[in-house]
């Protein structure tokens, strides 16, 4: 059987500011449940409760599973790697407390705060990519 899940970003809860206000986590979870989704991604840290007991209860009463979390890290910048590790571990501890070992982390480049990337979304050209030094830092950060 295929199970389908969604993420708070589908309701406008994003790691970077966009126009408008995102719905609160209760509405998002209610609508996920009513639509028939079986699980959710965590969303940005603080969007859903960060107390594992509270989060587990919110998910349980809607019969939803916590599948994973998106953790953005500015991978091309070595100075952010230590903080990225801390963020990933903080999220991993919450996921483990709520669902055990089944959820996963999606480690992604935090390019949502890079104006050149956001202003050219969907139209990024090769010249806007990383240079050799940034690729090396990116690879180190991802490993």
Where are these regions (language model features)?
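N-terminal pre-domain/capping segments
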Residues: 1-100, 127-143
């Amino acid at each position: 059987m295929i199970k389908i899940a969604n993420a708070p970003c589908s309701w406008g809860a994003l790691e970077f500011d966009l126009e408008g206000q995102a719905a609160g986590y209760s509405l998002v979870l209610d609508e996920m449940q009513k639509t028939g989704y079986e699980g959710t991604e965590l969303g940005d840290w603080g969007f859903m409760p960060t107390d594992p007991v509270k989060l587990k209860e919110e998910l349980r009463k809607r019969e939803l599973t916590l599948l994973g979390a998106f953790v953005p890290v500015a991978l091309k910048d070595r100075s952010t790697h230590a903080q990225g590790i801390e963020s990933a571990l903080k999220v991993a501890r919450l996921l483990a407390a709520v669902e055990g070992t089944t959820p996963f982390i999606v480690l992604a480049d935090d390019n949502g705060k890079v104006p050149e990337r956001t202003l050219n979304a969907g139209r990024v050209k090769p010249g806007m990519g990383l240079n050799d030094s940034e690729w090396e830092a990116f690879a180190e950060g991802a490993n």
